[in-house]
């Protein structure tokens, strides 16, 4: 019967991830079956924590996040949880021996979101490390099947990819982050302060990180390479759309990659991965 609960828990993480991110879900679907559920487990955990600080406005978020953090450590220690998302997450963390410091840094970044602030260069880097880079490192542990040598060799590239993805999210979501949640992640830039020069600097920084990250993606095992490459190509397409979009439009609407464009990315990415090895 425990196996039935484990499957149920895994299914919950899958549904949670798919409900909130169709793009990531598509990338995960292109991973080998053996590792797919573990990446869903990581993203289910991340999504639930993020939801606490982003959506539960009528409740005491600080209390809820603290409780979630305590339940996380209990689940990891006892290797069981009555929360299905934490159950599937603890199974993945314990199986792949994911460093708990990564989880601690992630939860710290969620705490940073509890109080609106304008970020400095230092707090910006701190937030990106905890909210995105460590998530990439958790996934990397799964991608390399816990191989420490491969993990350390690919770690710098995973960090760059996580950072680039998060910065694209920041630029895409700048309207809602500032207007609804009172957050401004880019250092010393509030919503109305974004101009063409600052937008260009942000995009150039992201493009440089994406270029570095690609070298790491090319070295991933076949079991994960295509799925990660697909996510990379999606974010690259979104970055290019943001680059071509005026600042005023970015500040007033959420820029998206439409379904037709996603279909083209899917086909192109598969052909490049299968026959051209990413060229």
Identify the residue ranges that each predicted region occupies:
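Catalytic cores of Mg2+-dependent Asp-rich isoprenoid enzymes
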Residues: 1-167, 171-279
């Amino acid at each position: 019967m425990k196996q039935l609960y484990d499957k149920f828990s895994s299914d919950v993480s899958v549904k949670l991830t798919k409900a909130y991110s169709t793009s990531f879900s598509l990338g995960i679907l292109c991973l080998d079956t053996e590792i797919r559920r573990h990446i869903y487990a990581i993203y289910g955990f991340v999504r639930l924590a993020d939801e606490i600080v982003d959506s539960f406005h009528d409740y005491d978020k600080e209390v809820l996040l603290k409780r979630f953090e305590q339940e996380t450590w209990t689940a990891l220690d006892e290797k069981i949880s009555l929360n299905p998302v934490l159950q599937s997450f603890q199974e993945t963390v314990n199986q792949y021996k994911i460093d708990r410091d990564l989880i601690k840094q992630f939860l710290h970044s969620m705490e940073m979101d509890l109080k609106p602030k304008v970020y400095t260069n230092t707090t910006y880097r701190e937030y990106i490390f905890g909210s995105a880079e460590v998530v990439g490192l958790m996934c990397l542990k799964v991608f390399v099947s816990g191989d420490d040598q491969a993990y350390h060799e690919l770690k710098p590239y995973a960090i760059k990819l996580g950072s680039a993805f998060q910065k694209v999210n920041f630029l895409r979501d700048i309207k809602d982050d500032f207007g609804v949640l009172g957050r401004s992640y880019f250092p010393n830039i509030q919503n109305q302060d974004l101009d063409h020069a600052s937008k260009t600097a942000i995009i150039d920084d992201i493009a440089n990180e994406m270029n570095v990250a690609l070298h790491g993606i090319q070295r991933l095992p076949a079991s994960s390479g295509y799925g990660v490459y697909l996510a990379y190509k999606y974010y690259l397409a979104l970055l290019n759309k943001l680059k071509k979009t005026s600042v005023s439009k970015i500040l007033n609407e959420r820029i998206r990659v439409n379904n037709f464009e996603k279909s083209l990315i899917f086909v192109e990415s598969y052909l490049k991965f299968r026959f051209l090895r990413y060229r």
